[in-house]
Amino acid sequence: MAVYCSENFSVYPQPSLHPPGAAAAAAAAAAAAAAAAASSGQRAGGYALGDYGAPANAGYLWGMNSPAPYLQGPPGSGAAASPFLPPASYGCSRGGQLVGSPSGPGSPSAGGAELSWLSLASQEELLKLVRPPYSYSALIAMAIQSAPERKLTLSHIYQYVAENFPFYKRSKAGWQNSIRHNLSLNDCFRKVPRDEDDPGKGNYWTLDPNCEKMFDNGNFRRKRKRRSEPNTPATTAAASSLGGLKAEEERPIPASGKPCGNSPPPELDPSPSARDHPKSSSPSGIISSTPSCLSTFFSGMSSLSGGGSRLTGGLSTDLHHRNFSAGQLSGGTFTPSSSSSQEVPSPEQLQRVAGPSPAYYSSFHPSSGSQGAQYNHYYNFTVNSLIYTRDGTEV
């Protein structure tokens, strides 16, 4: 009988393909069983699995050599053994074509060609073709741990691997070289010299006690360094770098993002004690004790406005003799006026040329109040000297 596989890989028998020899043997066995039941006064119960013998032991499938207990005949029945059902996993193919048939005594295709991978006598022959799922380091560790003294020579390690794993019996040159490399490069294996009273050749290899936990069920697992381990160089370096970053964050940052290059001289600083005051530990203390560049500039201008009364006389006389004038402010260009009259530009002209006027210009404008006439010349000089400079003038 041949076995086919359907598209979904299900095995089913084909009753129309029973060999004639098997059908005749089955009919003879059924007739003999019926005659024995009639002679003993019992009624024949029809065909049952117990009426058929076990299939002959065939060497075409490993692990299936023992006959199934439910296919054996009753003891002392004397039924002829004939192949009834082939193994369910034999002869499957995707296309539905016949791959092979059991080579039993009654099979017509006993001498047919079979696949080479199906001709396996035992599980050991199958293991010769399958590589074990262990690394070379794991194989070495298993060999060392199996020794009574927990140490082996290189030749003994080779012997252990070859005896316990049939896959490595075929080609010895490749894996033996890998064993030597792993012994030399892996820190878990240590070389122990021989004793003087121990004859032989080669040193012993032993396993580091700290690495025994790395080999879990034959799988070599490297131990990863924990981040929480104290007093390690990596932890110390990380702590120092974090301390440097924290110190950088505590430094005050100017509001404009640029260093205070235009800060007033020390004599114009209204509060020099603020610079010498120690920094507070809280962020609010850092912000309050360290003024920004803009606040420093405003404080300098306020100090200039407070001390402007002392400079009014000298500046007014000097400006009167030099005959400065505001001139015409149009289109961003300066045209000196030929007249000696001092013209004060309107606020609209100042806003068009220099943008929105800052707060520190309001105290010098003529329309600011009672001090307008006093700072008339000083205001004109300040605006013109900041925006338009005349060649050859010295202030």
From Swiss-Prot:
Composition skew (Polar residues), residue ranges: 325-335
Which GO biological process categories is it annotated with?
Answer: anatomical structure morphogenesis; cell differentiation; otic placode development; regulation of transcription by RNA polymerase II
Kindly state which keywords UniProt assigns to this record, in alphabetical order: Developmental protein, DNA-binding, Nucleus, Transcription, Transcription regulation
Q: Which organism is it from?
A: Gallus gallus (Chicken)
Where is this chain's protein located in or outside the cell? Nucleus
This chain is encoded by the gene named FOXI3
Q: What GO terms are given for molecular function?
A: DNA-binding transcription factor activity, RNA polymerase II-specific; RNA polymerase II cis-regulatory region sequence-specific DNA binding
Motif (Nuclear localization signal) positions are 221-227
- Summary of the function given for this chain in its UniProt record: Transcription factor required for pharyngeal arch development, which is involved in otic placode development.
- Can you tell which superkingdom this protein's organism belongs to? Eukaryota
**Compositionally biased intervals (Low complexity):** 234-245, 336-349
Q: Name one Pfam family in it.
A: Forkhead
User: Could you say which tissues express the protein in this record?
Assistant: Initially expressed in the pre-placodal ectoderm surrounding the neural plate, which will give rise to all craniofacial sensory organs. Expression then becomes restricted to a region immediately anterior to the first pair of somites that will give rise to the otic and epibranchial placodes, before becoming down-regulated from this region and restricted to the ectoderm and endoderm of the pharyngeal arches.
Q: Does the keyword Iron-sulfur apply?
A: no
Give GO cellular component annotations, separated by semicolons: nucleus
List every stretch annotated Disordered. 216-288, 322-370
Q: Known PROSITE patterns for this protein?
A: FORK_HEAD_1 (PS00657), FORK_HEAD_2 (PS00658), FORK_HEAD_3 (PS50039)
* Designated name of the protein: Forkhead box protein I3
Q: DNA-binding region(s): which residue ranges? A: 131-225
Q: Which InterPro entries match?
A: Fork_head_dom, FOX_domain-containing, TF_fork_head_CS_1, TF_fork_head_CS_2, WH-like_DNA-bd_sf, WH_DNA-bd_sf
